[in-house]
């Protein structure tokens, strides 16, 4: 038996619960940055390592080595009597889940997969994730795992193709239809599309929430992060990626934030600029002001060209002049 989790938060507790089998982490942050179609294997790892290292201020080779180990670890699924996937409902987990359902079906065809994926648990007013649970609670969940059926894999595969496509139309179709086979996927994919610049101000939802946090007197990176996390219906973004978004907002020709200090994260504070206040008032457009190239999954947002933006009234993206 093999257990796979998109992080290392519960792996030791699975041992404490007495669950048999090896435990593996596979945690590519696919909800951040470029995930273009047509790129796999070493080329995909190289792209992802470069992106993660740049955003999180890490060494590229160290990140690449870690991603390579994670991919190599998936080969342990070959020949297993069962592979158990441990997930929750948020965007981070759901993007990893659709990738793994597709990937494991390809590298270990015929190996039975089972899934634990929840959005709530008894005793928690607000359930964040499996990391909240102790060994006994995780052991009880193991007994409630459900087998992954072929139609669940097909749903995941279609969603992954749409996620990596340069045009969000297929994602919109999936979201509209719903994903009862993977019940948390549609909401997660909609949250993904909300990371596009919005029509009204050119900010992603995360960027807007960061500015709102600072306007509400959260000034340190950690305080801003907590404020943004509390605003999320399903918390999904790690602190280092959100810190990178804070740095973005404090840079460029018209910064929305003023940064004091450079010793991350404890020696840094932020305050709003005139641009930041104008953005929150709907009187400026962040994407136009800064013209910074971006990727949201497979969607490329080049500077100075028509790009996909999230339209709040429609609840989905529209192609708009940059």
Language-model features, listed with the residues they occupy:
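C-terminal engagement modules used by replication, chromatin/transcription, nuclear envelope/ESCRT
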Residues: 252-322
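A structured, charge-rich N-terminal accessory region that forms the first stable segment of a protein
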Residues: 1-62
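A conserved mid-domain beta-alpha-beta active-site/ligand-binding segment of alpha/beta enzyme cores
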Residues: 135-215
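A short acidic, leucine-rich amphipathic alpha-helix
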Residues: 223-229
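Short capping segments at the starts of secondary-structure elements
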Residues: 213-223
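Long, hydrophobic/aromatic-enriched structural stretches that serve as scaffold segments
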Residues: 56-106
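Charge-enriched amphipathic alpha-helical scaffolds
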Residues: 229-263, 267
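Short, conserved secondary-structure transition motifs
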Residues: 116-140
């Amino acid at each position: 038996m093999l257990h796979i989790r998109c992080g290392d938060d519960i792996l030791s507790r699975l041992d404490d619960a007495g669950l048999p089998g090896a435990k593996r982490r596979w945690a590519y942050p696919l909800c951040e940055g470029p995930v273009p179609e047509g790129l796999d294997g070493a080329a995909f790892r190289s792209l992802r390592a470069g992106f993660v290292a740049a955003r999180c201020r890490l060494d590229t080779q160290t990140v690449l080595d870690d991603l390579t180990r994670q991919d190599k670890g998936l080969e342990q699924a070959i020949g297993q009597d069962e592979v158990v996937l441990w997930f929750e409902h948020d965007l981070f987990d759901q993007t990893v889940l659709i990738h793994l359902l597709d990937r494991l079906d390809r590298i270990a065809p015929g190996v039975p997969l089972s899934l634990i994926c929840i959005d709530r648990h008894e005793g928690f007013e607000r359930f964040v994730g499996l990391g909240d649970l102790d060994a006994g609670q995780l052991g009880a969940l193991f007994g409630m795992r459900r087998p992954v059926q072929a139609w669940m894999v097909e749903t995941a595969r279609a969603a992954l193709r749409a996620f990596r496509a340069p045009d969000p139309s297929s994602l919109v179709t999936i979201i509209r239809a719903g994903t009862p086979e993977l019940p948390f996927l549609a909401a997660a994919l909609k949250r993904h599309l909300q990371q596009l610049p919005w029509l009204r101000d050119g900010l992603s939802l995360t960027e807007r929430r960061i500015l709102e946090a600072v306007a509400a007197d959260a000034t340190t990176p950690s305080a801003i992060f907590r404020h943004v996390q509390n605003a999320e219906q399903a918390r999904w973004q790690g602190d280092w990626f959100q810190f990178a978004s804070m740095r973005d907002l404090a840079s460029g020709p018209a910064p929305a934030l003023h940064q004091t200090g450079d010793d991350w994260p404890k020696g840094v504070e932020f305050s709003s600029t005139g641009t930041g206040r104008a953005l929150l008032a709907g009187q400026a457009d962040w994407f136009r002001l800064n013209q910074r190239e971006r990727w949201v999954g497979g969607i490329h947002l080049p500077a100075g060209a028509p790009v996909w933006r999230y339209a709040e009234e429609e609840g989905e993206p529209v192609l708009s002049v940059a």
